[in-house]
């Protein structure tokens, strides 16, 4: 569906959790193989940082409690000037077929403008990695920092992500 929209000239920007900010490493392990197709269609990709800046901290921290790490759990699509889909529904096979989650479609320019501003702020270099492909090599850039492998919270998370990739579980994610 995204490829069709791109072929019609629609700009598509995706904000997804980075390896470091995802709460289900198994999901990330199977998402990674779709990056080349996203790049091939000209889709812009951003991965939310597990160590975000002021915007992320403001949204996550509830004084006096400060989050040790922050993950992205937002499920929203902003389409055009006034349509927003938001809810608990993951956009995957399992959620659509098995889970009993919900979503709303809201048609309001004011709401869409607010959501767009929020998501744009979450895509800033302080909050997210801009993921690009240069000569077939994926790069994560955020401000002056550029990395050649997915930013993770720990070596254990990297090993877990590798092991999950070996399991035939994609249809269950």
Q: Predicted segments — roles?
A:
Residues 1-173:
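PLD/PLD-like phosphodiesterase catalytic module centered on the HKD motif
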């Amino acid at each position: 569906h995204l490829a069709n929209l791109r072929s019609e000239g629609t700009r598509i920007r995706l904000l997804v959790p980075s390896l470091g900010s995802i709460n289900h490493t198994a999901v990330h392990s199977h998402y990674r193989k779709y990056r080349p197709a996203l790049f091939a269609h000209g889709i812009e990709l951003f991965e939310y940082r597990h160590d975000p800046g002021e915007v992320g901290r403001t949204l996550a921290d509830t004084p006096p409690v400060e989050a040790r790490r922050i993950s992205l759990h937002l499920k929203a699509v902003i389409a055009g000037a006034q349509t927003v889909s938001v809810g608990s529904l993951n956009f995957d096979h399992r959620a659509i077929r098995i889970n009993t989650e919900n979503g709303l479609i809201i048609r309001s320019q004011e709401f869409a403008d607010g959501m767009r501003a929020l998501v744009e702020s979450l895509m800033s270099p302080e909050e997210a990695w801009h993921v690009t492909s240069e000569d077939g090599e994926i790069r994560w850039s955020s401000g002056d920092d550029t990395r050649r492998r997915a930013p993770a919270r720990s070596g254990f998370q990297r090993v877990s992500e590798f092991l999950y990739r070996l399991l035939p579980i994609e249809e269950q994610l």
